[in-house]
Amino acid sequence: MFTSFLIKYAEIGIKGKNRYLFEDALVRQIKYALKKCEGEFLVHKTQGRIFVDAESEFDYDEVVAHLQRVFGISGICPVVHVQDEGFEKLCETVIDYIAKVYPDCNQTFKVAARRARKNYPKDSMTINMDMGEAILKAYPNMKVDIHHPDIMLNIEIREEIYIYSVILPGPGGMPVGTGGKGMLLLSGGIDSPVAGYMIAKRGVKIDAVYFHAPPYTSERAKQKVVDLAKIVARYTGPIYLHVINFTDIQLYIYEKCPHEELTIIMRRYMMRIAEQIGKETECLGLITGESIGQVASQTMNSLIATNEVCELPVYRPLIGFDKQEIVEVSEKIGTYETSILPYEDCCTIFVAKHPVTKPNVKVIRRHEHNLDEKIDELVKTALETKELIIAEA
């Protein structure tokens, strides 16, 4: 019975003169999401509302599922919309709507009319009262409750009239692309895909870089990361995944540097490489899944040491999350089951038994100096031979 959806948004509504830019971005994201659904749809905005009108047969559950992944949407309202053929005809439509959506017809209700078209002959208060009277006459077992109704019956009077009573939750946030672009350091673990999701929710378009270490990490480990990128892409749109062969760099660091500093020094080179790719692709920052104190490389001292090599800002959406909170988000967005597949990352292969937790930046720099010009050549080769994979849902 539903042929349209009214899209609600929250934060966009408090924007100033540039609000239309955010609305236009949200319309684009909705159109992109619906391309993967059966059917034809018209997406349009009018007077602080965005509507999705189905122009052919469609799968209701499929459309709702795709809309619930579009950042910027706070609510999705399946609506019945009709032409204005007079108030009596509107009452008949509403009574029929209640019979189909709430067949028991014994709930409490409230009518909430919004008259966006000011030349409509009844004002909002009169619509509420007259419609309530018609409903009570048709369904004597129903009762009015203006404070805590079972059914909030919304009627929007525009060029057409829209009727809805259900608001399905959206993901919230801001439309992807309105917050700039960032480079995500993506691994096969639980944290980094969640970090990508969280930063994208704030409107940031993400690319990603993955550090692969064959033969120490398998093709299955690489495919796992590609699969994670595809899952995150359900929410973000296509992700350009840059795959770096990190093996020679890791082996050289392992040979030349103290083993307790391996993780920090390797991490610093990952940040350098990610930043170089980020600058080439017009990213405004790096994004990681780090959380304070979770592992040795994520103490505040360690984060200072890794930040020191970057000119771009480093965004850490999970910095104050504990592990269980991160797991809960990963389960919600669908990455958890893939993240726990038992394929090793490059960071887990070359791990010291006793990694330093309070690295001294001056000491780290001195040990990096031992890597001489060869490390620059290895980095250059890694960048020249990187693989680009476009991950789409």
Where are these regions (language model features)?
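RNA-binding accessory domains that recognize and position tRNA/RNA substrates
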Residues: M1-M183, P193-I239, D248, E308, ...
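Active-site adenylate/phosphate-handling loop in enzymes that bind or generate adenylated species
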Residues: E133-I135, G172-G179, Q250-L251, E255-E328, ...
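Structural beta-sheet core signal
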Residues: L184, A208-Y210, V243, T288, ...
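Conserved G/P- and acidic residue-centered "switch" motifs that form tight phosphate/ATP-binding loops
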Residues: G189
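S-adenosyl-L-methionine
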Residues: A233-R234, P238-E261
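Small/polar glycine-rich anion-binding or flexible loop at a beta-alpha turn
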Residues: Q294, P342-F350
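A short alpha-helix-loop-beta-strand transition element characteristic
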Residues: G334-P342
